[in-house]
């Protein structure tokens, strides 16, 4: 069945994940509607509620800190509430009953209240979204919700900020309860033929250490299983944060880069504050609701080929995408970019270009993949971070491989014109293009105001996303290494910097063996 199990680590990933799951839920169709082109069995698991009714809940494991879940209950409307008497009334070693102290429950958002009552919800805005659960449209299985009670969200006395804190917490809980066995194995073992795991995680705080502990354990447990990790963070780019914390974020992100870049099948770093943005994007980088929405468009589009039914082009599973960008098996870090457009405007432009091409007797408007210069360009670069460090100025970026996904009439070459990653005699970068027969839906839980495309009244977006391995990845890794070698202690420096150098060198092999790395002085 090619199932995918999703792991979400931390507040940032859950803002993104909520948008992602809302989008998946919107693809469900019911008779007499036509069958959805999306195979829901890949991401959703069937079940039976206590009342005997059928349920369909995400194959997801969601971690967050105490207080970060908002009004979300572990036991929701699909399942009976647990009877507290089963705990309080059973005999124990103490002669008297325990006194249970409960925190004041967080009231649901107005949006959630309307959904619960079957009413059309009001429009959301930055001030009305307090928690990621405030705009969730999906019910989760109780086993999907995992609260880390050791830390409170936004706790200034004991913040969950340092990479080592997250790694240490994972190791502690793994020794005590075997997290993988308790939390993840039930989801994996109910799959008929799992396609892989996808991880959404923060990387520039303690969640990076938590995710690193997880992925090392996953590699021990599941060997060569496909694991895609999407690493989210400011990585020191948020000027509103104090200097000391920004420097700590950069160290955290570098430690995450080393471990996740080495252990993941594909690791995609995503900046919360993209350096390259188009004029049609109005993003409030201080709002995780905004940031998660933009990230969800790209992530959901980039991987949609792995969820489509085979009858509508579902041939690009996670392994196919990996093979395209990572021909050596060692270039695991990908540069992610995308473009967004109004589908009606895009179709009009496409028709005009085709008409003009036919009139002149040529098809010059069609793109080819003969060399790097003729690869598609994108409007939004969520990978590159301007570290203002020594860079390979004057050297042209060399592309090794790229996987692209398009939704809408983007005027690209047909799939069968793309270069086959399995053909070693092809010259130039390997390239695979996948098309999806559905546009990205703009739901009422989505901040539609961040885009100024078309009339502004559309309910869907056209998306073109690309994941690339190129020498630009090595440039970013080396820039990170140059900075963190001045920030970390001698004991950690050698192992961390050597690990980063090894990752960067994979993008030199067969192309350019030179490096910009300096010796420690």
Swiss-Prot record:
A Gene Ontology cellular-component term: mitochondrion
Main location: mitochondrion
Top-rank taxon, per record: Eukaryota
InterPro entries named among the record's database cross-references: Beta-tubulin_BS, DML1/Misato, DML1/Misato_tubulin, Misato_II_tubulin-like, Tubulin/FtsZ_GTPase_sf
GO biological process, alphabetically ordered: mitochondrion organization
Stored Gene3D superfamilies: Tubulin/FtsZ, GTPase domain
Subcellular location: Mitochondrion
Parts forming coiled coils: none
Keywords recorded for this protein, A-Z: Mitochondrion
PANTHER family in the cross-refs: MITOCHONDRIAL DISTRIBUTION REGULATOR MISATO (PTHR13391), PROTEIN MISATO HOMOLOG 1 (PTHR13391:SF0)
Family (UniProt): Belongs to the misato family.
Function: Involved in the partitioning of the mitochondrial organelle and mitochondrial DNA (mtDNA) inheritance.
Protein name per UniProt: Protein DML1
Source organism (scientific name): Phaeosphaeria nodorum (strain SN15 / ATCC MYA-4574 / FGSC 10173) (Glume blotch fungus)
